[in-house]
Swiss-Prot record:
UniProt-reported outcome of changing residue 487 to A: Loss of nuclear localization
First-level EC class: transferase
Gene name linked to the record: PML
PROSITE patterns per record: ZF_BBOX, ZF_RING_1, ZF_RING_2
Mode of membrane association: Peripheral membrane protein
Zinc fingers (RING-type), renumbered ranges: 57-92
Superkingdom field: Eukaryota
Positions marked as site ((Microbial infection) Cleavage by protease 3C of enterovirus 71): 430-431, 444-445
Coiled coil, from the record: 228-253
Cross-referenced Pfam families: ANCHR-like_BBOX, PML_C, PML_CC, zf-C3HC4
Taxonomic lineage: Eukaryota, Metazoa, Chordata, Craniata, Vertebrata
Protein name: Protein PML
Length: 882
């Protein structure tokens, strides 16, 4: 028989039957499976069979032979129990640890089956004498035997038991028959030395056994623990009833959560259907080559649905399992109360009590989760941007045909590696009317060496022109109208090597790869496999024209803050970057001291995408002013705007909302690796602090698998470069003038440099990939760096050993004299580079700082020592992880 719905109001529904997390199939008729040997039952037989369906095995639905009661209160036959292993095949509940036996003989079900079998024989008029096999006429309730008239006379001659004719019993209902057989059960003394069973009415609570009068008198040690056995049975039945009543409250709580989860699953399905329909409607309006984007969006929606559905299904399954156990226990106690004998109650009470106690310990609150069905909003946003950008691109194509000046403006770079791919993309562009001549930089390759630019001139695309004025933009447009050759990737022979090197810059270093790789193209429309660069929302003082049709995939988020100080302090920032370049290289270098995370050495690390990540910090406010990330397919950008411009820019949002969009961008990928150019700079600690303020740092940790230090990696691949500033590397190897004020320009330069150097995820990057815990420890040590008691390089070395601020503070609190000395061994590599007069680890300054911190925040501020209360949350989290 198929499982019935979980909350069906039908009276014949059995709560102990198996259920499915989703809507189960309807019940099938039970005819054809009855084990009764009678081919023609009476009219009462089908009703009784339907009522006692709970006696069947709940796994195979056959009549249970040797029924076994599991700890989860499901009943199985012996065959299904042997095949189930160490867990219930119905609710998948494992056997409890320390249980003597995984299952109990269900003597209640076995006795009830035996009595029902006798009743069927009586009703079917095919009962035969137990002794002589003749047609039976009487039933002895004491011996539980069918007797013919002849055997009945002999039986009554010796035993004088109560026996009733079968004709009288056939007129009784099954309940009346079972009630009569139940009341005749007697309890005998548990002493096995009695020759004949002795009836008893005494129960010893010390021995937990029924005793006859003789055994009770001989057992003098438990004289005060003996009671009437009827009172003991009544007390145990009342205890089980009380536990059942308590479980009713849990049934209501679990039922409410179960209903909420069912509603959430339905809402999730409706949201999925609405999103898919919206996607299909919009995609029908675009041209043929955008259908690749439609498939990508549908797959992303389905992936999000599958991820959310699996999480909800697992919780729903857990709720179903607990509800099944609660209802099975309640039903079993009620049936035992109706049909079980006194001996059966005594035998099964302890097992039932343990199972019901475990059920009472279940808490539905721990199973509740914040059900989010709004996760499809980001796909709607991407769809809106895609549709609007394509529509604007078509309008721009018409204006470009009429305006040669607009048509000659260089477009954003994309990457098309194969010639046939380039021809296909070119054909699509010509079909849209977007194919125009574009100025390109020529990059040539030398056999055995590395690609270097033959010549380079400034090509200011809209994505990199944040710091260019209107005059410069106009000059750039005039310059770009001249006819320039397209970009050429060419393998040069040995004969022309010297001449080519003479025309190119001989002093320029070359990246350490032996294969010529095409840098990003600067013309052509976006292909489905190539990322496109979108428009950027600028401040009112940046009068730039946004990019055209190649900007479909980028999501632009404007965050509430200020960017005015970024423009004022750009020159000082460039000086700081230039002066600290050597120290950054030393700080960013690979370290052999750190222990690699197991996740980073995973053979499946190649499947984790690289996401190039950068952010800009305002020098005055020390807040995030820009944030950008890019992978092979899509880009994410955050531009800061003052709150005064919220009414002007429709996409202006708060910092919290912007960070949430960035977390959604990361969660759409499979735990990517974040590649940062200056990994150990002040940017990530500020970023961690912003996430900590909105309590989303844990979500960021789960969304990524580690951090890649891009600067030492590029330094390793191009050891002879004259400067490792990202702007100089982009100008040398990408023929690109990169704006240092743009986070998007930085991540695009990093991505294209890594493409040129053939950097791809895998075990070969393990020495440059750092776990989240190391960067979190580094962020927690920033108050010490800002207080000038711990150099940043030493903070990095401590972070590589997962030493956090709270660990240092705890060590000093335990031993104020020598508690910090043990951390000097982590800095042994640093001591060789310092002058003898300067200790590698200024224990005195650090101890003084902690002393002021322990004496009180007010005293510490009075002495001029900064108190790192703002970073305490990060410090505590890093300490727990380390």
């Amino acid at each position: 028989m198929e499982p019935a719905p979980a909350r069906s109001p039908r009276p014949q529904q059995d709560p102990a039957r198996p259920q499915e997390p989703t809507m189960p199939p309807p019940e099938t008729p039970s005819e054809g499976r009855q084990p009764s040997p009678s081919p023609s039952p009476t009219e009462r037989a089908p009703a009784s069979e339907e009522e006692f369906q709970f006696l069947r095995c709940q796994q195979c639905q056959a009549e249970a032979k040797c029924p076994k009661l599991l700890p989860c209160l499901h009943t199985l036959c012996s065959g299904c129990l042997e095949a189930s292993g160490m867990q219930c095949p119905i609710c998948q509940a494992p056997w409890p640890l320390g249980a003597d036996t995984p299952a109990l003989d269900n003597v209640f079900f076995e006795s009830l089956q035996r009595r029902l079998s006798v009743y069927r024989q009586i009703v079917d008029a095919q009962a035969v004498c137990t002794r002589c096999k003749e047609s039976a006429d009487f039933w002895c309730f004491e011996c539980e035997q069918l007797l013919c008239a002849k055997c009945f006379e002999a039986h009554q001659w010796f035993l004088k038991h109560e026996a009733r004719p079968l004709a009288e019993l056939r007129n009784q209902s099954v309940r009346e028959f079972l009630d009569g057989t139940r009341k005749t059960n007697n309890i005998f003394c548990s002493n096995p030395n009695h020759r004949t069973p002795t009836l008893t009415s005494i129960y010893c609570r010390g021995c937990s056994k029924p005793l006859c009068c003789s055994c009770a008198l001989l057992d003098s040690s438990h004289s005060e623990l003996k009671c009437d056995i009827s009172a003991e049975i009544q007390q145990r039945q009342e205890e089980l009833d009380a536990m059942t009543q308590a479980l009713q409250e849990q049934d209501s709580a679990f039922g409410a959560v179960h209903a909420q989860m069912h509603a959430a699953v339905g809402q999730l399905g409706r949201a999925r259907a609405e999103t898919e329909e919206l996607i299909r409607e919009r995609v029908r309006q675009v041209v043929a080559h955008v259908r690749a984007q439609e498939r990508e969006l549908l797959e992303a929606v389905d992936a999000r649905y599958q991820r959310d559905y699996e999480e909800m299904a697992s919780r729903l399954g857990r709720l179903d399992a607990v509800l099944q156990r609660i209802r099975t226990g309640s039903a079993l106690v009620q049936r035992m109360k109706c049909y079980a004998s006194d001996q059966e109650v005594l035998d099964m009470h302890g097992f039932l009590r343990q199972a019901l106690c475990r059920l009472r310990q279940e808490e539905p609150q721990s199973l509740q989760a914040a059900v989010r069905t709004d996760g499809f909003d980001e796909f709607k946003v991407r769809l809106q941007d895609l549709s609007s950008c394509i529509t604007q691109g078509k309008d721009a194509a018409v204006s470009k045909k009429a305006s040669p000046e607009a048509a000659s403006t260089p477009r954003d770079p994309i990457d098309v590696d194969l010639p046939e791919e380039a021809e296909r993309v070119k054909a699509q562009v010509q079909a849209l009317g977007l194919a125009e001549a574009q100025p390109m930089a020529v990059v040539q390759s030398v056999p055995g060496a590395h690609p270097v630019p033959v010549y380079a001139f400034s090509i200011k695309g809209p994505s990199y022109g944040e710091d260019v004025s209107n005059t410069t933009t106009a000059q750039k447009r005039k310059c770009s109208q001249t006819q320039c050759p397209r970009k050429v990737i060419k393998m040069e022979s040995e004969e022309g090597k010297e001449a080519r090197l003479a025309r190119s810059s001989p002093e320029q270093p070359r990246p350490s790869t032996s294969k010529a790789v095409s840098p990003p193209h600067l013309d052509g429309p976006p292909s489905p496999r190539s990322p496109v660069i979108g428009s950027e929302v600028f401040l009112p003082n940046s009068n730039h024209v946004a990019s055209g049709a190649g900007e479909a995939e980028e999501r632009v988020v404007v965050i509430s803050s200020s960017e005015d100080s970024d423009a004022e302090n750009s020159s000082s920032r460039e000086l700081d970057d230039s002066s600290s370049e050597s120290s950054d290289l030393q700080l960013e270098g690979p370290s052999t001291l750190r222990v690699l995370d197991e996740n980073l050495a995973d053979p499946q690390a190649e499947d984790r995408p690289l996401v190039f990540f950068d952010l800009k910090i305002d020098n005055e406010t020390q807040k995030i002013s820009q944030l950008a990330a890019v992978n092979r397919e899509s880009k994410f950008r955050v531009v800061i705007q003052p709150e005064a411009f919220f009414s002007i820019y429709s996409k202006a949002v708060s910092l919290e909302v912007g960070l949430q969009h960035f977390l959604s961008f990361l969660s759409s990928m499979r735990r990517p690796i974040l590649a940062c150019y200056k990994l150990w700079g002040p940017g990530l600690p500020n970023f961690f602090r912003a996430l900590e303020d909105i309590n989303r740092l844990w979500e960021f940790q789960e969304a990524i698998s580690g951090f890649l230090a891009a600067l030492p990696l590029i330094r390793e691949r191009v050891p002879g470069a004259s400067s490792f500033k990202l702007k100089n590397l982009a100008q040398t190897y990408l023929a690109r003038n990169m704006s240092e004020r743009s986070a998007m320009a930085a991540v695009l330069a990093m991505r294209d440099l890594c493409r040129l150097l053939e950097v791809s995820p895998g075990p070969q990057l393990a020495q440059h990939v750092y776990p989240f815990s190391s960067l979190q420890c580094f962020a927690s040590l920033q108050p010490l760096v800002q207080a000038a008691v711990l150099p940043r390089a030493e903070a990095r070395l401590l972070a590589l050993h997962n030493v956090s601020f709270m660990e240092l503070l705890s060590a000093h609190r335990r031993d104020r004299q020598g508690g910090l000395k043990k951390y000097s061994r982590y800095l042994s590599l640093q001591t060789t580079t310092l002058p003898p007069a300067q200790p590698a680890f200024n224990l005195q300054a650090l101890g003084t700082y902690f002393e002021g911190l322990l004496e009180g925040p007010a005293l510490a501020r009075a002495e001029g020592v900064s108190t790192p209360l703002a970073g305490r949350g990060l410090a505590e989290r890093a300490s727990q992880q380390s």
